Amino acid sequence: MERLEKQFFIIPTLQLATALLGKTFVRILPGNRVLKGRIVETEAYLGEGDEASHAWRGKTDRNAPMFEAPGTLYVYFVYGCHHLVNIVSEPRETAGAVLLRAMEPLEGQGFMERQRGTASASDLMSGPAKIAQALDINRSHSGSDLFSGEFFLENAPRIPENQIGTSSRIGISRGRELQWRKFVIGSPHLSQGQPS
């Protein structure tokens, strides 16, 4: 399958949140073990003006990868126990990233099940913290890019517009009016149900 190149990621964050749906996220572990998940849910986060974003007050040591080149991974730690995985989207020094909220496991499910402690396919990657745990991603991977080999995205047919849902972002206290969550309608792997 064709790997996505840098040009794919050089689009506005809100567009990337939609464009990522259906694409395959790949992690190559030591020993060439392959893990794959189909992206079925995302959320867009900008910088200045987006109070739900880590970068809305500017650049810090913690959020610095969010200001890197498009296609960079931004991984952060929350609640003292969870890692969340984002893909940087805006030009360098302009904050923007897409949070990977849910995936459908495609390859390496045995490893993912051991990582997660569950054999439920619909629950393996049905949330941003579950994705990081299933793929064994942590803060040490923040700043990695999607072009050097350990991580990359594979192309897949574009999801038709009538199969893409939109809602407000989940688990935030500010910016809830913004409809910046995107998801594949009907997927059993979503982090939360679809809005009625």
Swiss-Prot record:
It comes from Chlorobium phaeovibrioides (strain DSM 265 / 1930) (Prosthecochloris vibrioformis (strain DSM 265)). Pfam families: Pur_DNA_glyco. One of its GO terms (biological process) is base-excision repair. It is an enzyme of class 3 (hydrolase). Keywords: DNA damage, DNA repair, Hydrolase. Its EC number is 3.2.2.-. SUPFAM superfamilies: FMT C-terminal domain-like. One of its GO terms (molecular function) is DNA binding. The keyword DNA-binding does not apply. Transmembrane segments: none annotated. The keyword DNA damage applies. This is Putative 3-methyladenine DNA glycosylase. Belongs to the DNA glycosylase MPG family.
